[in-house]
Amino acid sequence: MSYNQKFLSHLQNFWINHEIKRFSWALGRIIEELPNFQVFQVIPNHEDEPWVYVSSGIGQFLGQEFFIISPFETPEHIETLAMLASASMHYPDQFQLGKTINIGRPWVEQSSFQHFLISLPYPYGQELEYMDNVRFFWLLPITQPERLFLNTHSVEDLETRFDERGIDYLDINRPSVI
């Protein structure tokens, strides 16, 4: 069984009864770096469920994959995951749990958030987090003040503030917790 087939099986076991689509990205250096790279899109069954986009291909090399949770469908997330997968192959130390990533543009149109925090998959737990020796990390959109807060505070301090405020991570312009 190929990595992507095993990967899809892991997603199907987690998101039972959800349609899951597979996408490739054919632009840029990722074609040479990760020729089997794909993004899987988990389609919500209900209006109140998010869209989920999951990278597939870097886990074979770095032992981790990333996912984005979105309030709506957009191909931007496929491009973002391809861009980050490529960058992670060149700068693996910058793509570890607790690090932040500046993606250079809003994570979705009409949002002011241009940074992701590489986080544990809190909305889904350990059942999704592990597939053999591969871990799944959540790319949580954060505000610029939240990113700057991490210069002097721990990720746990920021996560405590998220918990205390009960952030709506699907609100593309949620208030900063800082």
Where are the model-predicted features located?
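Acidic, proline/glycine-rich low-complexity IDRs
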Residues: 1-178
